[in-house]
Amino acid sequence: MKKLISALLTLALVIAVALSAASCILKIGGGNNGGNNGGNNGGNNGGNGGGGNNGGSTEPPDTENYIYLVKDGAAEFQFITGGNLDPLVYSAFTTMKEYFSELGIETTRAEDYKSGSVSDCEILLGDNLMFRENCAVDVHTVGDLGYVIKTVGDRVVIVPGSPDIAATAVNKLLSALEVRDDGKTVRVPRSLSETVHTEYELKSIALSGYDISLWSLYAAPSDNDVRALATAFRDTLYKSAGAWLEFADKPGDYVISFTAATEEETGGYGFLVSISGKKITIGCSVSSLFAETYSEFMNEVFLSGAESVSLPDGYSWSRDVTKLYYSDFGAVGDGVTDDFLAIKAAHARANQTGQRVYATPGATYYIGAHPDSISVKTDTVWTGAEFIFDDRGIDSANSSRNYEVFKIESDYASATISDIGSLRAGQKNIGVSLGYPALVYLRWSGAKKYIRYGANQDNGQDTQEIILVDADGNVDPSTPILWDYDVITQAVAYRADVKGITLTGGTVTTRANAADVTNYYRRGIAVYRSNTVITGVKHYITDEGNTGAPYMGFFGVYNSTNVEINSCVMTGHKVYNSGTYDTYSSLSNDVRWVDCVQSQSTTSQAFRNQRVAWGVHASNYSKNLSMTGCTLSRFDAHKGCWNATIKDSTIGIGITIIGGGDLVIENVTRYGSVFLTLREDYGATWDGDIHIKNCRLENAGSTAYVIQANYVLSNGTGHWFGYKCTLAKSISVDGFTVASTSSSPKIYVLSPVVRGAASTYDPSTDTVNPYTLPTSVTVRNVTGGTVSLTNSSCNAIKNIPYKKEQ
């Protein structure tokens, strides 16, 4: 038994020695690629490595010729990348990480060495600070489809020319790695170095005689859109020619400057590339078309397929991007084809891009009935073109009658103001800061104003007006709050457009409707935008028959401030059942009619008596209206005007107005026996001062009135108009001539004034609806007849303080 046990122990010892020897032989044999006889480079090095002491250790690392990324199954390195990786670069990084994960190796990544720890051994992927500061490799020299793989110290650098090539470069590195010891060792030769350059069709670029490599780029850092284009320019040149341009801090020599230029700076073209010595400018005045036109330039100049591009000093490339034409969108302009949709499409495009819109000179654009309007938000030029607005088929049931043909609109949507509690007349601030200047509409439904008297008597309208406020809610002194608002039923802010626009030229003929109704038609050009000018537009009317609906006004202004209608031709409409107008303003401020004329006679008595044409002008709820240098049939303010000026004009049918503030009439000729009428149906009121200077009344009869103001009494008091009425605070007449058909006309400054009044009527004792009289009337330099204050029998009127000077 003892012999058997001894024999077994001896056998176990022999087996143990044999296993130990076998293990030593396997370790000396090397890694995956080695084998007993060496094999390839990795196997040779493994096979040739020395054995460990006591036959139990592996070969020593060959750090002179290799970088060891993994030792003893643990990573000796970390990945270094930039912070915001392109998705393609991140995908390439993931490929590497998964490669090591499959070997059972956990790896780490730092997003740049300044935000993490620095290790002695790293794989640098792409552009990052460690790469820039420690690796003498210019990534841009290889082009967008090239790459560099090399070792620098104990770092492996992978530099793709662009994200598109990152995966290719990473796979190339992975194929060069040597994996040994069943994945416990991974190394890469220090001699690894591979550079692949992109082959380009465009091989050279010279600008003003200087190679592209000398140039850099500039775009204002604050202008994101322009800087994005400059970046796109850089990337395009890099991908097409391998030329990389850095950004400069400011414009200067050898700098290509991208700029949002003015139209003048682009020579009127809107887009201009210009080379002057060592400076290049690429500018566009239409920001929305910068990218599109820049692309056209690049395709024509740099991406045409040429092997070389040389742009000399003085070179320029331009495109007129400032305008587009109706014909570009299919408008025919033959006077027969309905061009409404094509014209609408042209303006829709321009409203997006900011371009001017042009009609083709000589074209006639026909526009029929459409329940829609053409929105205009950019300068528009109709010079030399004609339009036909055909209203003949539009009856009262056709909704097209409610639409303007052209609607000049704001760039900003109106905004409801909900946090104003109440307001008082004369209040200086509305208590709300809008952050921008605006025209503000106010309405209170709890009190009625302008309760009309007479043939068209009504129950009045809600208290309402417009005021101009600044960004802090301060009320502009020229548009004071006129009424008390115990409750604000509605308040709307119409932001004042910074950029003004102009509609220029063209002739429009309205073929009038024949509807036998009193419903008003629109069908014109309406301004709903502040800072707008309509100039040189001529409007005529044909096809007026025995019936027809009235028109609101071909030239309309609504909810706007600073609007001018200049050098336009207007036509009075035939009168049927209601007043009908060719120009109109409502709830607007600072509306000016300048050098406008009427196509018909404004002076013929027969013409006026036959009601061939109604007064051409009307307004409601407006402030600071003016008419200068015009020859028109009428200036008319229905529901109030605050401040009005008429100068250097001829007014045929009449000046009829109510309101307040300053009424200035200077160097104006009026035809008829009454120069100025304060409208009886709204209380013959002007709550302010009236100034008349150097004016003339033509074709007067035997009795002429400077001012006609009829305040109607009933049962000893006035009609309630929703407000107390005032003839005027003061009246000044300085220079007034009457040309009469009578040999000895009588001139009265005031008409009888109070209709139905007994001689004893005294406004001061009328405690219900008194008619406040002026505190002074001053007259000087009146010629053409015998002048007196009034022919009224009312003592209160006769006793108005009156001073006559010659």
What spans do the regions from the language model cover?
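Sec-dependent N-terminal signal peptides of Gram-positive bacterial secreted proteins and lipoproteins
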Residues: 4-23
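Extreme N-terminal leader/targeting regions
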Residues: 7, 51-53, 130, 438-440
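Intrinsic disorder/low-complexity segments, especially N-terminal tails and targeting/processing regions
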Residues: 17, 27-30, 107
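Ser/Thr/Gly/Pro-rich low-complexity, disordered linker/stalk segments of secreted
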Residues: 25-62
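Solvent-exposed alpha-helical segments and adjacent loops
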Residues: 59-322
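Extracellular/periplasmic carbohydrate-active domains that bind, remodel
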Residues: 112, 238, 242-249, 303-806
